[in-house]
Amino acid sequence: MRSAWGYSRGMHPHLLDVFSRLDRSRAALGAAVESIAPALREQRPAPNQWSVAEVLEHLSMVERIFTGRIADAIATARAAGLAEETGDRSPLADAIETRMADRVNRRNAPEVARPTGTLDAAAAWAAVEGGHQRLRALVSDADGLALSGVMLDHPFFGAMTVYQFIELIAAHEGRHTEQITEIGRTLAGSV
């Protein structure tokens, strides 16, 4: 049987929790994009700021990188005999949540996650959606396994579990949802 989110009710509660958060962030992102006229989605609000299409491309790039790292960590853990999930899930640390929500202090994306500007908004959205599908398929395939013990290193935030990495993806998406909302306000004021 499937839940309202389309997930199996037999899915481990830890995975349901993080997937539900990811779905909520995705819905908010979609609403923010839809609130901006399609003709404005490739327009930069200022020369040194990203367009909506570029923000979406960035999100797809980051998710692709994170999904690859999660895939490697799960594969390594499985090869070492990853057991069934019995542990508690530690949520993403409050300090990381706070940092991700901070839109006052600008951050510079690493080179590998900087948008090329070659995708229009529709193609960038499709890339984001495709990335989410790959992430969900990958992690769903490990449903019930001890993902709370599978650790990955983040270059800035340090060691995190698979669940925390998924929450980080949602928090990162939330940060950029706010950015898209800001872009929309700026562009609406310049029309």
Model-derived segments and their meaning:
Residues 13-49:
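An N-terminal domain-cap segment
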Residues 42-99, 129, 133-191:
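Short, contiguous alpha-helical
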Residues 98-110:
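A structural motif
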Residues 110-122, 155-163:
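Acidic/His metal-coordination segments adjacent to aromatic residues that form catalytic metal sites
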Residues 121, 125-130:
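Hydrophobic-ligand binding "helix-grip"
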